[in-house]
Amino acid sequence: MVWCLGLAVLSLVISQGADGRGKPEVVSVVGRAGESVVLGCDLLPPAGRPPLHVIEWLRFGFLLPIFIQFGLYSPRIDPDYVGRVRLQKGASLQIEGLRVEDQGWYECRVFFLDQHIPEDDFANGSWVHLTVNSPPQFQETPPAVLEVQELEPVTLRCVARGSPLPHVTWKLRGKDLGQGQGQVQVQNGTLRIRRVERGSSGVYTCQASSTEGSATHATQLLVLGPPVIVVPPKNSTVNASQDVSLACHAEAYPANLTYSWFQDNINVFHISRLQPRVRILVDGSLRLLATQPDDAGCYTCVPSNGLLHPPSASAYLTVLYPAQVTAMPPETPLPIGMPGVIRCPVRANPPLLFVSWTKDGKALQLDKFPGWSQGTEGSLIIALGNEDALGEYSCTPYNSLGTAGPSPVTRVLLKAPPAFIERPKEEYFQEVGRELLIPCSAQGDPPPVVSWTKVGRGLQGQAQVDSNSSLILRPLTKEAHGHWECSASNAVARVATSTNVYVLGTSPHVVTNVSVVALPKGANVSWEPGFDGGYLQRFSVWYTPLAKRPDRMHHDWVSLAVPVGAAHLLVPGLQPHTQYQFSVLAQNKLGSGPFSEIVLSAPEGLPTTPAAPGLPPTEIPPPLSPPRGLVAVRTPRGVLLHWDPPELVPKRLDGYVLEGRQGSQGWEVLDPAVAGTETELLVPGLIKDVLYEFRLVAFAGSFVSDPSNTANVSTSGLEVYPSRTQLPGLLPQPVLAGVVGGVCFLGVAVLVSILAGCLLNRRRAARRRRKRLRQDPPLIFSPTGKSAAPSALGSGSPDSVAKLKLQGSPVPSLRQSLLWGDPAGTPSPHPDPPSSRGPLPLEPICRGPDGRFVMGPTVAAPQERSGREQAEPRTPAQRLARSFDCSSSSPSGAPQPLCIEDISPVAPPPAAPPSPLPGPGPLLQYLSLPFFREMNVDGDWPPLEEPSPAAPPDYMDTRRCPTSSFLRSPETPPVSPRESLPGAVVGAGATAEPPYTALADWTLRERLLPGLLPAAPRGSLTSQSSGRGSASFLRPPSTAPSAGGSYLSPAPGDTSSWASGPERWPRREHVVTVSKRRNTSVDENYEWDSEFPGDMELLETLHLGLASSRLRPEAEPELGVKTPEEGCLLNTAHVTGPEARCAALREEFLAFRRRRDATRARLPAYRQPVPHPEQATLL
């Protein structure tokens, strides 16, 4: 600013002095410091004596002139110029001993006292500029020695002056620092170090230089900090018993160093075995005397000066010694029945070569013990702990230096290994948040330690073990899912068991083993799913390009849904040679699981092939490249495609061809003429809820490009497109497969149901046919063995019950002959043809109140009969023969009439006009009893149904049946077939009133009130014998119908009749009395019965029907009166001994079979063998 102000004043003075006498000249004088210079001034006249005047020299910036001379008086001189200035040659000023500060503007003035002109005061002055050149000189420098704490900043300032102005630079150890770098910066002669380090210490030199010379200044920077190790220790190897030295030297400021040595982080002076043999020298070296094997290890040198953290340096000491056994236990336990190990604790340096074993003082030969081997460390491995392992063992190890000797003897003991008292299950499934207790306990000698570990990731503080060693997970968390192991270990052995814990009700677990296979413009991502948490999980693949700049942390991730059940996905449309990040996310109904680890992969570029030589480049038109960057976007208007034009186009682009497909179908042309100027297209004609793939092909002239990249898009939820209405061929394969499978399953199910129904109907029809055709098979007794003791007479124990065996019967039953209507006697030589006989109305055969077949009255004969039939009187047997065409197998339990000519269950008889139904016969009443229906153990009897008051009567074929000779009266006095059986007392109706009226009345009440008749319980059908004719069926008790249609059981001793007292057939409220079947045979434990009524019972029913239909009264035998034949048969029942009883029973059966065979021999229908007859043979 001073120089600027001086120049301004000087210019003002010059401008003012320019008037009248011209412009004054400015003189510049240059001098060197220390020398002299003359500032010229020629204002005095050159010749003559000048007038009286005053000479002044002014310096710009000074208030007073620096030099004033008046006449001969002594000059007045500024103190800064005293002794250095004087006039020379008039008014010129000579300055000696120039200084740098003398540089500046000077003005010379001469005032003539005799010529005072005020306006010319400034005219007698001239300006002179003095320039003083000097070498550089430092005005400010740092101290010669500077101490700075490590890691603190420091600034070194160096300021120099001179003319010309000098340039200041900094050097460190002779190297120019320039503008500085890193932590060091140099600017305007100032050196700044932001953070002083150990390497920053040294001598810094400041140098100021110009054309007049240079000046330097040195500063030593001392960094206060911890020592620096300049000579670290080195690894050493020494034989045992030799001395070793480990060097260690450090430098530091301040230099008050203290060295410390450590072995394996323990001060060597604190180790008792090293303390008497270790020395630390002044230079920091460690001296170790008489090394031992235990001296081997890592030794660390730590120098310290008390500042901050001291450094350290380590070296490893290796001691070589022969192989030796450290500590052989006196006893070694081995687990019984498990593998075991006899260890030989060995140490050796150089490494162990081999170990020799002795057992009981003799060399051990492993080849004599199968399963024994030696491990790499020399231990004996025993495959199975048994008595062969017992003994005393000793081992001797060897290495390249030899051996230190054999080991002490160890004695092998056999002990039981730990055994689990309670093992965990293989798997546990539990809801999250609940408590899970997994038991695990073991025992052994010594007691084992039971511990739980989780394989893989562990749980911190979430798993507890109670006093019983059971694992407690409270509460159960998602992290507890996985594989757990329970181990029990002691000195004998270690055993372990494991279990898997599945935590339900959680989000999916992270997927594992994510791998990415790079493909051209794509990548194939695969993974292993984790546990789904108990719900169906779905996967999605996330990917994004890797950021090229590290400071860019935001990424736009793209996700692709994975089909259900898949564990891989192909990611298309990636840029080649660009790194992408991939991750897989699992989700279920409860939320999302964690992302998998991120995997990097770069898609490969399309393979390139070398171009074939062709025309010069000027003649080859550029090829047409495919469209670029095809993207499909879902919009409210539909699917919108965006793309970029091809990069290479030989000439004008004509257009594009849009192709598309669904799933894995073939490509179809959707739009063959897309304008070449278009870069977007709204795709029409799509179907809702379909996944489409699109691609573009460009064409220009005769050139057609390759297809562009494929763009995938789903139309799910786009209402602008119609729902699926295409042909079944366009259905997705899973849906189509499901529909076809459902239709096939339904068809197969219907077909199987039809076949099963047909088969069941055929079997039911066959079973019914066999039941109709089959009658009770005859009983054939095998020859008796040894006779039983007499004391066995009358025994009712199960041992006395006859055992039966079912066999086939070649003889047709009487029921077949009765059902088919064939005569039982000798066939007539001229039998009437079926056509001439004509149908006869049949009397319904019903079951009586006691369960037996009974007959009702004969039906009135038709009005139209042949002459022979009208003239010939009807016998009761002929009239009763019609009754065998009735059956009581109707669902309601009422008698159902059947036709004799056609009894097939498949083809029912043709409908005929209904006729008045006759009253039910005794046999049908018998069959309609509720307890008789309960006696059908085969389950074929239809259940009782509630009667309908408006139910129409069942159809009955009233055509007459041919008269059978079997039903004719015998020549001998008629004897009831029932009377031929022992113990049978039959009351025939002898009064004018037919006895069937009581039965009809009772049957009517049964039909009207079937629900009021209690059925006999099924529990009453208790079998006491293995035969079919034994007491397997409980006989009906003697009952009397009450007003409500029920029956009451008589006293146990009542065996006379069903009606109590003197009541007989003429009474309407009673029915015929029948004795218990238990008294019909000589054997009280056996009866000639079967599942269906027997032959004799049917014959007896026929006889009863004949007796009840006779017009003439017959005398009714009194109750308890027996015929001579009955008495004879009854007397046979009182035999003594099982052998006699069996012989009598055999005679009775042989007589019965002779009568039956004689009867069936006359029936033609019985000459044909029955398909599946049965016999009951007494074993």
Curated annotation (Swiss-Prot):
List of residues that carry Phosphothreonine: T972
One annotated Gene Ontology cellular component of this protein: inhibitory synapse
GO BP terms in the entry: axon guidance; dendrite development; dendrite self-avoidance; homophilic cell adhesion via plasma membrane adhesion molecules; regulation of synapse maturation
Fibronectin type-III domain segment(s): 507-611, 623-718
A Pfam family hit: Ig_3
Domain of life: Eukaryota
Positions glycosylated per UniProt: N188, N256, N513, N524
UniProt motif PDZ-binding: location: 1177-1179
Domain (Ig-like) ranges: 24-124, 136-216, 226-318, 322-410, 418-502
Gene3D superfamilies assigned: Immunoglobulins
Subunit relationships: Interacts with MAGI2 and SHANK1.
UniProt-recorded name of the protein: Protein turtle homolog A
